[in-house]
């Protein structure tokens, strides 16, 4: 049975659609889990979902827990879970966390924890001006400078949310599996939908990247990072994306915790 090291950290990212969790040892993620978000689950039910990720005989060896959430109700459930099952100290990452980021926004308290983690993760991992695109329930596009200036964010309906809304409202359009489109203009309903849904989202992202670069010509190099559950689907269609980094959010939470702790 796997033994945890003396420095083992559980990181939890609570989103609107999914909850992702990672176990970190010696600055490396060694295990990962993802499951659907639901306010109807109890702390005990969520703990049962964590069991495959954890060595339940060594819970006390997890000496720190890091959490970020954009769902307050789920945050309360998970804090109860930590109190009930763990003895580790819990660190919440939010806009008040002392990370050295300068937020050029009207009210930093409204910035989602995931956006903060993405920005900080990009800052620490890539040491460059960065565009971070996160494909989740919403698609977020944010820009942070190498010096740590959080310049702002664009929020659009996520690809799957947009597709679900279309299928729900259009009587003659049946739901389809979202896969890479094979044509630009479809000659049947399925291909037409795939092109409009997937290509349309990708072209929006490409345009945003180019517009951000146009507005920041003073930057020597801008690294564009794509993350989120469907990043692999969209990545081939967005030429200006440099990196697919599916762990940047969890990594960002972990790196934020390390920065605050030390």
Feature roles, as predicted:
Residues 57-60, 125-127, 216-219:
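Glycine-rich phosphate-binding loop signature in dinucleotide/nucleotide-binding domains
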Residues 38-42, 111-113, 118, 123-127, ...:
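Glycine-rich phosphate-binding loop plus the immediately following alpha-helix
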Residues 55-111, 147-152, 158-159, 187-198, ...:
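Short beta-strand-loop/turn "lid" adjacent to the catalytic site in phosphate-handling enzymes
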Residues 55, 87-88, 168-175, 198, ...:
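Generic secondary-structure signature for well-ordered alpha-helical cores
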Residues 33, 39, 181-223, 241-242:
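Adenine-nucleotide phosphate-binding core of ATP-dependent small-molecule kinases
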Residues 219-262:
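Long hydrophobic alpha-helical segments typical of transmembrane helices together
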Residues 2-30, 122, 128-150, 166:
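Gly/Thr-rich phosphate-binding beta-strand-loop-beta motif of the actin/hexokinase/Hsp70
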Residues 1-98:
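N-terminal glycine/serine-rich phosphate-binding loop of ATP-dependent small-molecule kinases
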């Amino acid at each position: 049975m796997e033994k945890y090291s003396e420095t083992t950290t559980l990181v939890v990212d609570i989103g609107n659609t999914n909850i992702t969790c990672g176990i970190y040892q010696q600055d490396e993620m060694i295990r990962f889990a993802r499951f659907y978000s639901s306010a109807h689950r109890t702390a005990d039910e969520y703990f049962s979902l964590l069991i495959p990720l954890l060595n339940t005989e060594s819970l006390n060896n997890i000496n720190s827990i890091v959490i970020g959430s954009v769902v307050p109700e789920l945050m309360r459930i998970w804090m109860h879970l930590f109190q009930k099952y763990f003895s580790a100290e819990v660190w919440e990452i939010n806009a008040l966390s002392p990370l050295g980021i300068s937020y050029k926004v009207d009210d930093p308290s409204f910035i989602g924890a995931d956006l903060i983690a993405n920005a900080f993760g990009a800052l620490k991992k890539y040491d460059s001006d960065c565009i971070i695109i996160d494909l989740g329930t919403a698609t977020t596009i944010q820009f942070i400078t190498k010096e740590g200036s959080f310049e702002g964010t664009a929020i659009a309906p996520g690809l799957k949310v947009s597709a679900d809304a279309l299928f729900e409202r259009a009587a003659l359009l049946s739901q389809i599996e979202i896969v890479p489109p094979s044509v630009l203009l479809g000659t049947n309903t399925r291909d037409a939908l795939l092109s409009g849904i997937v290509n349309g989202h990708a072209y929006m992202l490409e345009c945003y990247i180019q517009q951000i670069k146009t507005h920041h010509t003073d930057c020597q190099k801008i690294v564009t990072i794509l993350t989120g559950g469907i990043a692999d689907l969209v990545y081939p269609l967005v030429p200006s994306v440099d990196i697919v980094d599916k762990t940047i959010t969890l990594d960002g939470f972990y790196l934020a915790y390390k920065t605050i702790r030390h």
